């Protein structure tokens, strides 16, 4: 028995080491290729330049950074209220029979491939926006934000619903004993008690939205420009890499890898925030 436990211990250790090595290799690849490219282009020019014209050796990714921020921000404006309120409903208001139906639906949303979401956006959302907004061809920040807002719902609901459900029942019962209604007890006592978990769920949603590529590429327009309206098309960091990596060479290829470094930095900051919030929640 001890021998079997020892073998399993080594298996788990090997799995952990493989995971760490994989992340380390990715980091080495990104930074070894990306940082030299930033030096060649110029850090300020690369991060704040507004022109992306590889044929003229202009590699400014500021429009793509703005595009990623606008699309992600729009997705949060749409997805966070819906996701959090759905989590509250499922944890504290939902009848058991409806919960058994609603939970698999949320899980199914999480399992739908990105390309299917993108096809839905291209066939349904883009024509809808084109028809109702005369100044847009449909492929825009607004369309991508709506689509991403739907896509991050399973992430937000899946992470925040258990947190709300895990709040001690004594909090809720104490509020009822003081004369509060069921709704008031939930929204003034239970939800604030779960705020660290809900915020962590939102941060996970940000990471999901920021890293999404295929669905966004199909509906966002992909113009590398600084937008003046949510009805205009933009290009995000991820779509820029996917669209051009297949034919890029030399400095152009290195600039795309450097774009990956910037994206990696964004995701790293988000994960650090998530870890900090989890620690503060435990304390």
Named regions from a protein language model:
Residues 3-6, 10, 32-75, 95-96, ...:
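Periplasmic/extracellular loop-to-transmembrane helix junction in inner-membrane transport proteins
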Residues 1-16, 274-283:
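Transmembrane alpha-helical segments of polytopic membrane transport and secretion proteins
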Residues 216-263:
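Interhelical loop and adjacent transmembrane-helix boundary motif
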Residues 5, 95-100, 168-169, 173-200:
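Amphipathic cytosolic juxtamembrane alpha-helices at the membrane-cytosol interface
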Residues 107-148:
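Generic hydrophobic transmembrane alpha-helix motif, especially the helices
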Residues 74-106, 274-280:
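Transmembrane-helix boundary motif in ABC transporter permease subunits
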Residues 161-165, 169, 176, 203, ...:
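C-terminal transmembrane helix and the adjacent membrane-cytosol boundary/short C-terminal tail
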Residues 159-160, 164, 182-218:
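Transmembrane alpha-helices
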């Amino acid at each position: 028995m001890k021998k079997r436990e020892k073998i399993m211990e080594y298996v788990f250790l090997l799995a952990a080491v493989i995971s760490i090595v994989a992340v380390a290799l990715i980091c080495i690849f990104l930074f070894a290729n990306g940082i030299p490219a930033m030096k060649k282009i110029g850090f300020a020019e690369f991060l704040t330049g507004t022109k992306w014209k590889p044929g003229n050796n202009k590699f400014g990714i500021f429009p793509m950074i703005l595009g990623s921020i606008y699309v992600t921000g729009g997705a949060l404006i749409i997805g966070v209220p819906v996701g959090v309120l759905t989590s509250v409903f499922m944890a504290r208001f939902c009848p058991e029979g409806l919960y058994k139906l609603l939970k698999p639906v949320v899980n199914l949303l999480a399992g739908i491939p990105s390309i299917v979401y993108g096809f839905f956006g291209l066939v349904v959302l883009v024509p809808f926006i084109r028809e109702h907004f005369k100044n847009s061809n449909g492929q825009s920040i607004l369309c991508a934000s709506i689509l991403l807002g739907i896509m991050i719902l399973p992430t937000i609901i899946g992470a925040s619903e258990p947190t709300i459900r895990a709040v001690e029942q004594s909090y809720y019962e104490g509020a009822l004993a003081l004369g509060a209604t069921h709704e008031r007890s939930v929204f003034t006592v239970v939800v604030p008690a779960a705020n660290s978990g809900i915020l962590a769920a939102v941060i996970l949603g940000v990471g999901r939205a920021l890293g999404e590529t295929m669905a966004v590429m199909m509906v966002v327009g992909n113009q590398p420009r600084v937008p003046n309206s949510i009805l205009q098309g933009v290009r995000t960091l991820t779509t820029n890499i996917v669209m051009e990596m297949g034919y890029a060479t030399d400095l152009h290829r290195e600039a795309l890898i450097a774009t990956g470094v910037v994206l990696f930095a964004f995701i790293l900051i988000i994960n650090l925030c998530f870890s900090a919030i989890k620690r503060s929640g435990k304390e």
